[in-house]
């Protein structure tokens, strides 16, 4: 509840609690944002528990950039430290809370932990442990003002990290998280690496495109995909450095990347972060049935768009209807045009 209320804060408005109340009984039906905050706390707990279960043989030590994912994560962590610190200093609690949720859930949990957990089984286990604990410890300290109880419980069960070492390398851990040293932006500034962030964002774009296509066409997670990526020379170089990360995450049978590669036949195209990702669907889906489905959706969208345009062409409607109603109709027409463009492009992919 505390975290949810913080995410609802703005600089110039009262907090509006998102509760849906039954008009007759006056009882709470649900609170979507509260449920989302609850899910986030559960995510923090489960991610922390997973990492702590994999700390056998761990000893505290300095974090070291060994992979592109490490460089990306440490850079994002440095920016998170700066963002949260400035949020506290400037009283922008809503932006801070939403920002830390996006960082820990979408970047730490969904990507860094997933990419790094394989290293916990190999020769680089100890350094992977140190890097993960460094990220977790810093994140827990950043989230402590927002949700003090769960973070205190997690931190109390964590091993010491590099943040607890004194100048001689001895462990000097605080008795409680609430009096532990705050992560200072100046100490993390050395990790900021824009090139590393760009490289990993490209990796995420390719993997996300493959996963979205797999989900959209209900393909088995075990089904290997043929993926082709077209981008500029610099981006291709960055992607090649992350090939060993992309291939298992996207579960590719083949991964072809280049500046002038051709779009494969019967493939779906996804454009993200300035790169074109083509996922071959031939042999994976019924192309004729999929094309028929898309054409049916196009017909429905065209019909609705024609209705919107007819209404907007009526001068009486535009003059007499509330401005908000007119704008809503215009927004829907614009949205339908975007939908039609996307659907038409998808049909072309199957041609």
Tell where the protein language model's regions lie, with residue ranges:
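Feature 926 captures the class I aminoacyl-tRNA synthetase adenylation module centered on the KMSKS loop
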Residues: 19-351
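Alpha-helical recognition segments enriched in aromatics with Gly/Pro capping
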Residues: 1-25
């Amino acid at each position: 509840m505390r975290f949810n209320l913080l995410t609802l804060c703005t600089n110039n408005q009262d907090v509006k609690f998102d509760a849906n109340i039954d008009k007759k009984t006056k009882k709470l039906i649900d609170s979507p944002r509260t449920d989302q905050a609850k899910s986030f706390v559960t995510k923090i707990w489960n991610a922390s528990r997973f990492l702590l279960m994999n700390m056998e043989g761990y000893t505290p030590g300095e974090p070291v950039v060994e992979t592109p994912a490490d460089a990306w994560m440490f850079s994002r962590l440095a920016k998170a430290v700066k963002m949260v610190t400035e949020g506290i200093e400037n009283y922008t609690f809503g932006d801070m809370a939403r920002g830390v949720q996006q960082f820990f859930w979408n970047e730490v949990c969904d990507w860094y932990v997933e990419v790094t957990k394989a290293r916990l089984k190999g020769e680089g286990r100890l350094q992977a442990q140190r890097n993960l604990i460094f990220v977790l410890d810093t994140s827990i300290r950043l989230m402590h003002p927002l949700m003090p109880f769960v973070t205190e419980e997690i931190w109390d069960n964590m091993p010491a990290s590099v943040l607890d070492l004194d100048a001689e390398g001895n462990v000097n851990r605080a008795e409680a998280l609430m009096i532990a040293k705050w992560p200072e932006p100046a100490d993390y500034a050395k990790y900021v690496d824009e090139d590393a962030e760009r490289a990993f964002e490209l990796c995420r774009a390719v993997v996300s495109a493959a996963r979205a296509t797999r989900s959209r066409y209900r393909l088995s997670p075990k089904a290997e995909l043929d993926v082709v990526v077209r981008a500029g020379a610099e981006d291709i170089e960055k992607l090649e450095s992350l090939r060993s990360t992309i291939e298992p995450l996207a579960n590719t049978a083949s991964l072809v990347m280049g500046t002038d590669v051709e779009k494969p036949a019967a493939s779906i195209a996804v454009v993200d972060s300035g790169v074109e990702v083509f996922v071959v669907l031939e042999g994976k889906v019924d192309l004729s049935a999929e094309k028929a489905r898309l054409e049916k959706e196009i017909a429905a969208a065209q019909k609705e768009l024609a209705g919107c345009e007819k209404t907007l062409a009526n001068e009486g409607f535009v003059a007499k209807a509330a401005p908000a109603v007119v704008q809503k109709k215009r927004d829907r027409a614009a949205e339908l045009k975007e939908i039609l463009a996307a659907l038409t492009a998808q049909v072309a992919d199957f041609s």
